[in-house]
Structure formats: structure tokens, C-alpha cells
């Protein structure tokens, strides 16, 4: 999994993720941007589920983060979209709406994101 942090001309940090992990970048950009306290909440939740079979969930404006001891899943809240109203032959594109990664990888992204924010 590859990622990149960018700062736009207004100073807003954007996270760009490799293919298959785009929803993680969207989560950082849409949910965390301007609310770094969310990262501490997620880290505390990871510590809280460690060694157990419990899960933890944080529902945001656009994305929901669900984690257990081993894996983090981020999905768009709109992913439950029903395609019944779509024309025949049309598909709902959701490749960028759902991503999975290991807890350790996710913690590494959080650490790198913080370091980027602090200019390290």
C-alpha cells in the first residue's frame, strides 16, 4: 500500500492512496482534515480492541471506519446504494468506496500523516 501527502495552495493537506486503498485517503481528506483529535480516538480504539474479538466503529459524515484487532475497513456511507433504479446494463462504481488494510499499516499511515502535518 502506497500513500502520498500533499499540501494545496491553501495549506490543506490531501492524502492520496494507491489503487484499492482510495477510501482510506478519502477518509483522511473528508473526516480527519481539520479534526486531528479523530486520530487519537482511533488509536485508543485500536488499543481497546487489542487481544479481544470486539469491533469498534466510527460513523462519519461521508465514511465509516470499522476495525477489529487485525484489520481496518473504511467504507463510504453511500455504499449501501441500491441499483434497482439504474438502467439495465449499468453498474454502480464503488471501487473507491471500500478499502481494507491491516491495523499496523493503518497506524503507520496515522504516524506519517502526523509527521507531515508537523513538517517533519
Curated annotation (Swiss-Prot):
Q: Which domain of life is it from?
A: Bacteria
One Pfam entry name: UPF0231
Family the entry assigns? Belongs to the UPF0231 family.
Against HAMAP family, the record matches this protein to: UPF0231
Q: Which NCBIfam families match?
A: PRK05248.1-1, PRK05248.1-3
Q: What is this protein called?
A: UPF0231 protein ETA_08290
Organism (species) = Erwinia tasmaniensis (strain DSM 17950 / CFBP 7177 / CIP 109463 / NCPPB 4357 / Et1/99)
Mind giving the lineage of the organism this protein is from? Answer: Bacteria, Pseudomonadati, Pseudomonadota, Gammaproteobacteria, Enterobacterales
Amino acid at each position: 500500500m502506497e500513500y502520498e501527502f500533499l499540501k494545496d495552495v491553501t495549506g490543506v493537506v490531501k492524502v492520496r492512496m494507491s489503487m484499492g486503498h482510495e477510501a482510506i485517503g478519502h477518509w483522511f481528506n473528508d473526516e480527519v482534515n481539520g479534526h486531528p483529535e479523530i486520530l487519537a480516538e482511533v488509536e485508543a480504539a485500536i488499543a481497546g480492541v487489542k487481544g479481544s474479538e470486539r469491533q469498534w466503529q466510527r460513523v462519519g459524515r461521508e465514511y465509516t471506519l470499522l476495525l477489529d484487532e487485525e484489520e481496518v475497513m473504511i467504507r463510504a456511507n453511500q455504499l449501501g446504494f441500491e441499483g434497482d433504479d439504474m438502467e439495465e446494463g449499468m453498474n454502480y462504481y464503488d471501487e473507491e468506496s471500500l478499502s481494507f488494510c491491516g491495523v499496523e499499516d493503518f497506524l503507520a499511515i496515522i504516524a506519517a500523516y502526523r509527521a507531515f502535518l508537523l513538517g517533519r
